[in-house]
Amino acid sequence: MSRLSLGLAAATAIGSIAAGIAFAGPERVKYPEKFRQDFVMFNTVDRPDLKAVRLVFINKAADAEAKAGQPLPEGSILIVEQRKAKLDDKGEPLRDAAGRLIPTDEIMTILAMEKRKGWGEAYPADKRNGDWEYNVFKPDRTPNVAVKMDGCFSCHLNRADRDFTFTYFKNRQDRGN
Amino acid sequence: MRVSILAAATAALAAAPACAAEHVVLMENIAYAPTELRAKVGDTIRFVNADGTNHAVFVATRGHGVDLGMQKPKAETVLTLGKEGRFEVECVNHPNMRLVVVVTK
């Protein structure tokens, strides 16, 4: 191999690494265009302190491939749709017969995490969440660029034994399949 | 008349809800105390953060999902048990902090 081709190969390799690092970030996670068709809701989490209900979804393809106790498959996308809870005339959340908050149709924010092979390589070990990346969207589905994702990484790092998820991995374990 | 008064009193007693109990759970030394709790529907659990660090009350168990937010040292939060079932409370910050709650009628 000539010096020129060696140089080109090295430059290409360096360029690829640099590109990977440069593109790491929330913009890699897009709002799923076919969210209503392609996702399934698997849990709800009441947030009485925020007067909100979090509806938690996973894309159907990942749900079909996932197995209890195993890391989620590549291509998994988890979405949390945070909706305002129904309130009484004093502004306090109403509850249903089981004591659960009642979600309205009003979306407050949308949280997303997506797993793609190699996405985590750009992050240092003390931050990396496997191959997960995060993004936050406004109710109109555009990215909320004011939100820093460091909080997502640090909080989800506490659930490394569940593939960095708070609900899905545990829910599959509880289900046993 | 005596019969009707007695009948009314009996009906009132029957309609009155059973007294709800409050259970206190300490968050201390990066653990919940106790780690298992049995309660009735309508009872409450008061979580008291006796540690010098933030804790949380988070339930991922399907059908019981709730997140009471970050709880600072000395702060208290209350969880009302609205339905039967078994669920696990965990601290968002400390993955080994677990409390199993079994709620019956």
How would you name each of these model-derived features?
Chain B
Residues 10, 15, 19-105:
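Extracytoplasmic copper-binding redox domains, predominantly the cupredoxin/blue-copper superfamily
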